[in-house]
Amino acid sequence: MDEGSADAGASGRRSRARGSEAVARSAALERLRAIRDGGARAAAAVQVRIEAPIYDTVAEEDYAALVARRRKDAGAFIVDDDGLGYADDGREEDWTHRTIHSSSDEGSDGEDGAPRKRKQPRPQSKRPPQQSAAAASLSAAAAMMGKQRLSSMFTSSVFRKPGSDRGRDSSLAADSIVDDVIAEFAPDDNDREERRRRVGRVCAPAPAPTTTAHIKAENVAVDTAMAFRSDNVFEAHEVSDHGNDMDMELKPDVEMEPKLDTPLGASAELANNSNSLEEPKQEANGEVKIEKVHRLNAKIKTEDSRNGDMASATAGWMKICGDGDNAGGEGAVAANSNTGVDESSEFELKDGALPFYILDAYEEPFGANSGTVYLFGKVEVGKRFHSCCVVVKNMQRCIYAIPSSSIFPRDTISRLEKNSTTSDSSPSLRASLHELASGLKSEIADKLSDFNVSNFAMTPVKRNYAFERTDLPNGEQYVLKINYPYKDPALPTDLRGQHFHALLGTNNSALELLLIKRKIKGPSWLSISKFLACPATQRVSWCKFEVTVDSPKDISVLMTSTTLEVPPVVVAAVNLKTIINEKHNVHEIVSASVICCHRVKIDSPMRSEDWQKRGMLSHFTVMRKLEGSIFPIGLSKESSDRNQKAGSNVLALESSERALLNRLMIELSKLDCDVLVGHNISGFDLDVLLHRAQTCKVPSNMWSKIGRLRRSVMPRLTKGNTLYGSGASPGIMSCIAGRLLCDTYLCSRDLLKEVSYSLTQLAETQLKKERKEVSPHDIPPMFQSSGALLKLVEYGETDACLALELMFHLSVLPLTRQLTNISGNLWGKTLQGSRAQRVEYLLLHAFHARKFIVPDKFARSKEFNSTKRKMNPDTEAARPDEADPSIDDEGHHVDQGKTKKGPSYAGGLVLEPKKGLYDKYVLLLDFNSLYPSIIQEYNICFTTVDRSADGNVPNLPASKTTGVLPELLKSLVERRRMVKSWLKTASGLKRQQFDIQQQALKLTANSMYGCLGFSNSRFYAKPLAELITLQGREILQNTVDLVQNNLNLEVIYGDTDSIMIHTGLDDISRAKGIAGKVIQEVNKKYRCLEIDLDGIYKRMLLLKKKKYAAIKVALDGSLRENIERKGLDMVRRDWSLLSKEIGDFCLNQILSGGSCDDVIESIHSSLVQVQEQMRGGQTELEKYIITKSLTKAPEDYPDAKNQPHVQVALRLKQNGYSGCSAGDTVPYIICSQQDSESTHSGGIAQRARHPEELKRNPDKWMIDIDYYLSQQIHPVVSRLCASIQGTSPARLAECLGLDSSKFQSRLTESDNQDTSSMLLSVIDDEDERYRGCEPLRLSCPSCSTTFDCPPVSSLIIGSSSGNVSNPNEGNDASINFWRRMRCPRCPDDTDESRVSPAVLANQMKRQADSFINLYYKGLLMCDDEGCKYSTHSVNLRVMGDSERGTICPNYPRCNGHLVRQYTEADLYRQLSYFCYVVDATRCLEKLDQKARLPFEKEFAALSQTINLALMEVQKIRDRCAFGWVQLKDLAISI
């Protein structure tokens, strides 16, 4: 048998094997044909309209031949999908059976799960019925997705099958239906575009799981909020087919799909225009009617309504970019100018030494290069400045051994020095000193040998010590100086011996020694002598030039007669755009934008026209495609066009993230930038960049180009537990060594006071530009079109430009350079906000120059990171090994939760304010730099103050020799005074330069006191800090006494360094005259202290300590007035914008000067209007946003479940967003679920949502209006109106639509009137005296009914009303009880209901005991209505003049004080009330003799019943110490 017949035979056998099902199917087809050809049309027959044949009818032999031909051509029919198993073998599958397929890429089609199979199209062949079933829903999909897509051709009536029941059970999303149909055809360009979109949707993570619903033809509701979600997942509703063949179409003027180049970050804004969502509903005629359904009860700003008068940041950048002026051209030449200089170029030498301008320095603390310091800066070569690295080798440790007193006896030393002519420089003296120290040297040598130190040198030197270690002698003495290389191990800090007490300097870094010993103070010109240029093959850096010196003594500060030019620097602003990999919950980079500014001045500010001029800027962006996808059509051509137009590569397209990172590093290396700039670049961009380089296995010769040191191993990038402000982690700073890091996020927090420090907020408030926010979830859908991706490029470059512009706007580089030059630390540390290190280095330079041994800096220890501080700040005799281990390299305190302590000594004096509204002029006078002035005034210094052994505050120094601190401060003050004199005559940029210099001097001087009182400071000295604050309190009190007693003026408030004087005058000139008189009287008492007029207030509202608002008048005589707020809720960021606006309105009304009635009426009507707008959904969503800062990482909060901002941060972090670290500001809104039975289900923290969550799910959440009215608006307004007559918290609550009864607080003005000061004896009216007391509640012995027992005095009151003549007819229950002594509900004949004397006494005692227990529970509650923190624990923190135990634990978020909920006075009043209830004798005694007679007999009989109870409760009350006065405390024994 030949091959063809064999195949035919096999086919025949297979066809016969198809069995009864195939035969039945053939029979059914025959009946169908008969019906179609005009056969009997019975009523029961199925009516099927067939416009074209479904199957071909062929003979069995023809079918076998067809199968054989298919099998033969199977290989050419379809490609085997790279071996994934999808191929056609020519067989026809039985569609009535389910089959298992190896391909997971193709889903099932229809309810029977048949595979989608590709066939060669033939004119006579028809699509299987299953495709018709899928097409039944296609009309809805076409309506939803738009008719311009390829799938719209499938919506014709040919593919609709009436009466199908399958459509009801199908659960295919519209996108899947369209893709399934398209997959049946050969791929074309549109198909590829659709598959790219599908991949983009797969890469875009969904905010919430979207269930696929059925599509219902009679009611197609397209939720545009869902349709425009950033994840682009489509949610459709059910469609059911009916007998009528209904056409579904949308009105042509309704656009249901956003344009591809529309930024999808604006999805919620598009969807929620005018506070509504558009829902299309289909009517009977087949048309879809658009209805608006209100979802979110707040308005969401659209792009058009948002800051119409504010310039677009993107448009601003495009204008700067221009037509290529700043893209290539001179900027590109400047970037590549290094190419014309090679290593053979000669340096510009001066006197044989290399002038080198230092910018940064770095050392490797461990490893083979330990002790090697790398200096990075600029050198001049060929009339241009280029980068250079100076490698300083052979650094030596410098350790001081403090000998015992027997080594260098004082009398022996005195005799030797007297005999010596030139002190310790005399050879004979040095020989004698070596001889005296021979035993010490021998012991030290043995110790060094034990630690494998073989090469060392020792010499006796004279040094001073004046710091806090009590085990070391103060004053000048001889010590043993030890030098040995850094490559050898460090000696232990606690090493001691027979001949020495301690070793100091064991852990000092090589970099610190180099800066201090060589007197290098920040960016400056150095002279490098005896250097050796390194060839390119041996270099350890990426700098253009590199030299090596073998000794640090070859480096010195360059001293020239002429001032050398300060070299400009190259600044590169970097911005990354990332997407979130939900599987691993990490950020992946999709684009990186860099804007480079060449020749940036660092010695003076730069105007925008200077740094934006032609040739100053260059830019480029690197973008990669998403994994498994391709770039949109046309993007490659657009990239080429842009590059050609710019003359350089401004847009590079890469195939993978690894290629993107390589390209970025290469471009950064070409720029050779000195400064990296970015917004939150420390906390996000660099961290993501380096982690992705690590994950993508970018080679070390590439990723190390982010810095200037060549590296082979990436350092650890973990941030650890450092508090915010320390900037980037040590690992990141190690990677970028050689380049300065300017984070505008950190700088803005230091220099500005803003609600939020996001780039969007700062661009709006500081730069007056509107920034487009693009979240990681918005980016994947943008890969659908080239236009959207080009927008993404613009957004990335715009963000980089905004960070650059913010840096220039704040003059960050000139200001931080001045601070660094004053302090003498590293510029990079100053840029990272290391304020403590600035003061530390300032003192290190000062004390080293005076031959002092400085205190050791204790490094952090891992094993002690989470433990409490070992050194008790109250103990002066703390040993050095008990120092706080939580000091990091920058001197920042590690947040350790509850172990964190406040100051352990009293702070500044804060006087009790005279609260109220003042409508006459109020003067504010304050001392200029009080604490630095006190240091100078009283010569307070480490070297002059004698510390007391008992730990008490030391006395003022008697020494006339000026100490180091006063001398240092004096020089700073004189320099600032000189600069300010220059400032008066300067103009333009020179004026700005002087202003920056005087600001830097002021900041440095004012930071001096902080290092003394900060327990983690290297120069911490609690006795000095205590002495300074004590003098500050005395000075303020003396000033108040002088003003009140000598000048007869009223001081209404005082705080630390300032006082407020109420003049009682309406004439501002006379008020100024009073101020001048006060200044004259105060200043003549002091030498360095100086008080000055700081403000004149026309009207003031003084609420409480540190909280006031006033209208401030300009001091220059102009009529300018502005409202100044201190400590009010409106200036705190943890209140919503809505509450701040209402608070400002109320404040303006109160300070307006209008009548009290008009002010109250205006406030009440405004509150009514506001609550109506809020409940009506007319308030903008942005006004509900509350912002709070994270003080630690969100996962480190022990009470995270109760903190709204922490819950939001945890949710954001889980979804991969940035901005969730310690120090970040988190915005949130308190919401309630729309579909929840209870609108307040869950706590406040559980109902807090990020604003973007509301915009993405407007149909799920709604604003909790009641929360904002009761917790945000009411507390603010009630506190402002507390001193205004005519309103109350209950009345304000009523205006806000709240339950006024909830605001009838028992704790009424505890600040104004202490309940303990109210004497019960002076209040004659019992109702007033015992107002608020709980009644005596008795329980019936028979029926157990509880009822209130009236006072026995009710008998007299009731009888006076006419009930005494016939008591049995009296209707007063009070009178009936005392006469019946029975339960009011029980009949008189029931003896069991009688309240016996024992029952009355026992029940009264039990209730008295319950109130005593309530008192001893000691419940404390914060008096701040916005806080209401309650606790049973006592907080022993001391702040200012507040009593110990009264500081709210929520400080500094809350400035309230803890007050007892149930005080001694409350308990005594309650017990007194119980006595009053049963004291019949006292009631009779209060009556006149004539009025007493009718009641004596009745009361005498009643006394037998109540005397037992009275005696019991009186005994309890008399034990209460509150009711007694101790005379011994009032009198003095003689």
Curated annotation (Swiss-Prot):
Catalytic activity: DNA(n) + a 2'-deoxyribonucleoside 5'-triphosphate = DNA(n+1) + diphosphate
Subcellular localization: Nucleus
Zinc finger (CysA-type) residue numbers: 1340-1386
Gene3D superfamilies, sorted: 2.40.50.730, 3.30.70.2820, DNA Polymerase alpha, zinc finger, DNA polymerase family B, C-terminal domain, Helix hairpin bin, Palm domain of DNA polymerase, Ribonuclease H-like superfamily/Ribonuclease H
Source species: Oryza sativa subsp. japonica (Rice)
Lineage: Eukaryota, Viridiplantae, Streptophyta, Embryophyta, Tracheophyta
Compositionally biased residues, Low complexity: 1-12, 127-141
EC number: 2.7.7.7
Residue sites binding Zn(2+) 1 per the record: C1340, C1343, C1383, C1386
Protein name in UniProt: DNA polymerase alpha catalytic subunit
SMART domains registered for this protein in UniProt: POLBc
GO cellular component: alpha DNA polymerase:primase complex; nucleus
Protein residues bound to Zn(2+) 2: C1422, C1427, C1448, C1454
Family in the record: Belongs to the DNA polymerase type-B family.
Extra facts: In eukaryotes there are five DNA polymerases: alpha, beta, gamma, delta, and epsilon which are responsible for different reactions of DNA synthesis.
Keywords: DNA replication, DNA-binding, DNA-directed DNA polymerase, Metal-binding, Nucleotidyltransferase, Nucleus, Transferase, Zinc, Zinc-finger
Top-level taxon of origin: Eukaryota
GO molecular function ontology, one term from the record: DNA replication origin binding
Keyword Transferase annotated: yes
Feature: compositional bias, Basic residues: 116-125
Sequence segments annotated as region (Disordered): 1-23, 96-141, 864-905
Secretion signal, residue range per the UniProt entry: none
Segments carrying motif CysB motif: 1422-1451
Example GO biological process: lagging strand elongation
Top EC class for this record: transferase
Residue spans of biased composition, Basic and acidic residues class: 864-882, 889-898
Function: Polymerase alpha in a complex with DNA primase is a replicative polymerase.
